[in-house]
Amino acid sequence: MTAFARFLGEKVERYIDLRHSLGYAFSKQAGTLRAFVRYVERAQFDAPATRTMALDFVLSFGGAANSRATRHGVLRRFYEYLAVYDAQTEALKRRAFPRSRAIPPPRILSEAELASLIDACARISPGIPLRGLTMATLIGLLASSGLRSGEVVRLDRSDVDLTNGVLLVRKTKFRKDRLVPVHATTQTALCRYARERDAAFPSPKDQAFFLSSRGNRLSATGLQCGFAQVRKFAGLDDGKTLRPHDLRHRFAVTRMSLWHQQRANVQALLPVLATYLGHANYSDTAYYLTGSVDLLAMAAERAFLDGGAA
């Protein structure tokens, strides 16, 4: 290994440790950075880290424009860290690889639309009643708790306290477990699902809380496929993007709308919502303030009436 590759490898590992200490999972990014070290070693590059070095590495993967932009973004932020130790490190341009399209804005469902989405679950796989009930319970939980879809499908039976209505969410996006209390109506729905699930699969293949029609853990792909079917049956497949993650946005927007209506101090309550949602930074939660035209209008009215205190 060359001296530069060794130096780079040491800094990459320290940078990964730093990101972990800040609460980030950083697994995919760590893989990209370690691959970059191997690339530098194979090419026998010497210091300093240059723009050309980074561009050639990113282009060596091929793939979609968004993948290249993501890899380059990981390197750009690492280069900023590396420059502290080697001032000759070249700064990478922010938009060297433009993304092919913007991420679609979240779609915030009305109460009627959410109800139609849940009602439509009964129409999928009518010969397998548990599948429809699984989707209905999942969608209700996503909408009422703001959990990420990945967090929901990873729930084990031991993570769901049906007596007290509390979920233990493990392996979150930022590597921290958290307790999530649910509403009494959600608790009742989870209890009903557990009874029906156990009747259908008295000897399940694993300890997952949500099961597929085969009796094993419902996968993220299974959730996406089921959601697409339900969306179509509900008449919401109308050209406007609707993803399971939009239910998380809806939860946050609904909660903040309620706080505005109650004339509560939303900024002071953001840390509470951030903890509940499992955000590492309050700024991530503040993003939801822009998630709804109605919410923006409400916040603007509060700011006007209260002299700027929203």
UniProtKB/Swiss-Prot annotation:
GO MF entry, a single one: DNA binding
InterPro entries noted in UniProt: CB, DNA_brk_join_enz, Integrase-like_cat_sf, Integrase_catalytic, Tyrosine_recombinase_XerCD
GO biological process per UniProt: DNA integration; DNA recombination; establishment of integrated proviral latency; symbiont entry into host cell; viral genome integration into host DNA
Keywords: DNA integration, DNA recombination, DNA-binding, Plasmid, Transposable element, Viral genome integration, Virus entry into host cell
UniProt keyword DNA-binding present: yes
Keyword presence, DNA-binding: yes
Recorded family membership: Belongs to the 'phage' integrase family.
Protein name in the entry: Putative integrase/recombinase y4rE
